[in-house]
């Protein structure tokens, strides 16, 4: 259904039917997991506040960052007319940012704590996505590289923080089940992110035509980045519900 929504000619009734079927199946699966004695996926860890927050809001964040490597090459090649080598070289800056910040992530968690770090860095993630929406064919290469590098830094910090906090307060006996549930949700979020990116491009096409902005290079992709930034912002709402000392058993170690 999500894939159909992102096509040029979405089939209304088929899409609605698939969404309805998926919703009913999902609710039935939840009911089954809660009732059966030995479910394939146990939901016991959902009673842990930190795990629940990272699963709900964290999934929206993972979906939004998963859309970035899909949107950027398309914007550079289809929207701006770059060749594949040029576009791919620019996108590498995101992954350089991912790698170079890794050694500093743990000290940042211990310094700020999980809640403060996820809120501050989450806001920076939103700004980085909005900055991608401001990129034009005339933007200097060094500015594009800086924006993408910083975006990679922020997404890496957020991803590591969420993944660490998820298991910080989960009791030992539930750890295996929690890991299965978290891994499943992560993979679903990655697929959802790509679908949301395609839908965002489609919405960007419609909005750009409605506002008579179709002559602006890459406008549909740039508007898609705005939509993804909003999704990332919504994912931060759950973080506000965290206790001030959430995950302190992990973040306070070796201080």
Language-model-detected regions and their locations in the chain:
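Short, intrinsically disordered terminal tails adjacent to the first/last structured region
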Residues: 252-255
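Phenylalanine-glycine-rich, low-complexity intrinsically disordered regions
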Residues: 1-15
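12-transmembrane solute porter fold
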Residues: 11-13, 18, 38-207, 216-246
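C-terminal membrane-cytosol helix-exit motif in multi-pass small-molecule transporters
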Residues: 1-4, 21-36, 235-243
């Amino acid at each position: 259904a999500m894939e159909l929504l992102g096509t040029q000619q979405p089939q209304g009734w088929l899409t609605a039917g698939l969404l309805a079927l998926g919703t009913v199946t999902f609710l039935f699966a939840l009911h089954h997991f809660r009732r059966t004695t030995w479910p394939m996926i146990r939901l016991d860890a959902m009673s842990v506040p930190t795990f629940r927050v990272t699963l709900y809001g964290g999934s929206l964040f993972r979906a939004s960052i998963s859309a970035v490597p899909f949107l950027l090459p398309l914007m550079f090649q289809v929207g701006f007319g770059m060749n594949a080598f040029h576009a791919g070289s620019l996108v590498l800056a995101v992954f350089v940012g991912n790698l170079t910040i890794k050694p500093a992530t743990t000290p940042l968690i211990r310094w700020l704590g999980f809640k403060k770090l996820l809120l501050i860095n989450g806001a920076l993630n939103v700004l980085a996505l909005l900055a991608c929406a401001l990129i034009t064919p005339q933007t200097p290469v060094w500015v594009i590289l800086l924006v993408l590098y910083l975006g990679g830094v922020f997404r890496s910090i957020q991803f590591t923080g969420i993944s660490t906090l998820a298991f910080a307060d989960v009791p030992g006996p539930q750890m295996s089940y929690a890991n299965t549930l978290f891994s499943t949700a992560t993979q679903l979020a990655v697929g959802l992110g790509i679908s949301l990116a395609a839908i965002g491009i489609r919405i960007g096409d419609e909005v750009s035509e409605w506002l008579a902005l179709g002559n602006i290079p890459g406008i549909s992709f740039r508007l898609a980045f705005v939509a993804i930034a909003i999704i990332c912002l919504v994912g931060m709402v759950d973080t506000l519900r965290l206790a001030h000392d959430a995950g302190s058993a992990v973040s306070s170690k070796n201080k």
